[in-house]
Structures are given as C-alpha cells and as structure tokens.
C-alpha cells in the first residue's frame, strides 16, 4: 500500500498524477491537511476525493488540534531538550491519531514535511519521498525557509533541527520539476517530476478525469491574438495583506506582460475567494 500526503491543491495534483502514473494498480491512502479547504467545504470535498477513485481512502490531518498539544512555543533561545520535547509531543499525537501501522506502507510520498507527518517520519527515521513545495522551489529553499520562519517560529526551529523540507537522511528522493530550478542547481536525490510531461506522454488518457476533478472548463478563444495566461498568487500567504497593494502588484504585472496584442486569461488561485 502507498501513502500520499498533500498540504495544498498543487500537492494534491502532484499526488494524483504520481499515483495514476506510477502506482496505477496499488492501493493508496491520501492524507490532506485540513487547511487545504475552508471549513464549510471540507466535508463535501473529502467526499469528492474519495468518489474520484484516485485513492483507496482519504482523510484530513487535523493540524489545528495537533497545535494545541505541542507544548511550549520555541524560539532561538530554546534548548535541545525543549525542542526534543515538542517534537516528541507532535510525534505521539500524530501516531495516536493515525491509528495505523506506518510500516504497512511500501512507499510514502510527502509534500510539506514540516508538518506532523513529516516530523513523525523524520524523528522516527522512517524513509519517505519528498515533493518540492512548489514548482522550482527546491532550488530556492532559503527563500522558502524565510517564509516559514516569518509564519511560525516553532515550526521553523523544528524544521532546522530535523532537517525538514527534504534536507535529512530519511529522504529517498526529491520529486521536482528540474527545468524550473535555478541555474546551476544540483541535488543527488533530485528526480524529475514534470506534471506537464507526465500528463502528455505517460497518462494522456487520464487528463479529462483530472481536469474534471478540479472543475476545469474548456474555453475556446477566437481571434488571432496571442494568449497571456495569468496565474494569480495567494499574496496573503506571503504576508501581503493590504488589498490596495495586492491590486497594484497584479495590475502592474499584467500591464507589463500583457500588451494589446494579447488576450488575457486569468486562472484563479485555489485560495482566491
């Protein structure tokens, strides 16, 4: 049996594509962070995931409840004993919640290993495969670390101590889109995982099912103009909360990249409201 873990809709896409391409006939369980969807739509979305048949079973990881059992918050002055205590609290809480023998899974694929599953696996020296957090992010870990540090210092301290984000010896491989990494990037554990290529060359017959699952709608754009596809960003995650600033950033980018010779097509971010 295979275990997949997703913390964002992008990660869910990675898990679905990987499952269909490399483990089409294997039973698989999917764990999703509860934050992947707003509270009011979680129940219906979980049913949608299960009904899709991509995975044998699926459930949410209640990270919010786990936070209450971590213990004291950590900072740069925390001792190793204090750090280990918090890690042990998280691991025990996750293990009790999982209520399964983790060794039954032949392979484990984890996205965002700085959360409870990744902390549990790393602290117990259990091997797993790591999905990069976003396309091209494996080569920009310093930027990613700065974001997580500003979001939660306790998590940052644990990340550094355990070597989360794919930086520890438990990691068997790092699945990433090699063409989108920074120039000169090299990692001996990096394995090319390009969703576009896999969909086009390995599982083209599954593309309609995947598009339908994510609510994709085909649009025919008429005319001779070139197409500019704009993928919006969840700026709130980057601590850019001012709506006027968000609007300025978006309009400036569109004005710069999309001239009159283009038709602008906007693909909303999954967290856009």
Regions found by a protein language model. Give the residues of each.
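Catalytic donor nucleotide-activated moiety binding site of glycosyltransferases and closely related
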Residues: 257-273
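Alpha-helix C-terminal capping segments
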Residues: 120-124, 254-259
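Residue-level signal for short, function-critical loop segments
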Residues: 34, 134, 234-236, 270
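A nucleotide-sugar donor-handling region in carbohydrate enzymes
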Residues: 145-232
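A conditional alpha-helix N-cap/helix-loop micro-motif detector
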Residues: 87-91, 207-210, 243-247
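Active-site and donor-binding regions of nucleotide-sugar-utilizing enzymes
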Residues: 3-166
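N-terminal beta-strand-loop-alpha-helix module at the start
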Residues: 1-23, 27-30, 40, 216-221, ...
């Amino acid at each position: 049996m295979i275990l997949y873990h997703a913390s964002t809709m992008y990660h869910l896409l990675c898990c679905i594509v990987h499952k269909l391409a490399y483990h089409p006939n294997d039973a698989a369980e999917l764990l999703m962070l509860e934050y992947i969807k707003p509270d009011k739509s979680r129940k219906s979305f979980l049913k949608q995931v299960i009904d899709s048949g991509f995975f044998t079973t699926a459930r949410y990881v209640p990270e919010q409840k786990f936070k209450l059992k971590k213990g004291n918050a950590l900072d740069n002055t925390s001792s190793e004993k204090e750090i280990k205590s918090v890690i042990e609290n998280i691991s025990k809480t996750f293990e009790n919640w999982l209520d399964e023998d983790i060794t039954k899974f032949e392979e484990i694929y984890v996205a965002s290993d700085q959360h409870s599953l990744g902390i549990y696996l790393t602290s117990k020296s259990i091997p797993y495969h790591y999905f990069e957090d976003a396309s091209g992010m494996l080569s920009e870990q310093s930027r990613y670390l700065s974001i997580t540090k500003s979001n939660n210092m306790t998590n940052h301290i644990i990340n550094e101590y355990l070597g989360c984000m794919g930086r520890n010896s438990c990691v068997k491989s790092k699945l990433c889109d090699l063409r989108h990494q920074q120039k000169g990037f090299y990692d001996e554990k990096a394995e090319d995982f390009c969703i576009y290529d896999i969909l086009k060359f390995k599982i083209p017959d599954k593309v309609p099912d995947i598009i339908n699952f994510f609510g994709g709608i085909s649009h025919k754009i008429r005319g001779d103009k070139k197409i500019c596809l704009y993928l919006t960003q969840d700026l709130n995650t980057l601590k850019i909360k001012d709506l006027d600033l968000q609007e300025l950033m978006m309009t400036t980018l569109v004005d710069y990249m999309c001239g009159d010779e283009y038709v602008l097509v906007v693909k909303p971010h999954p967290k856009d409201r």
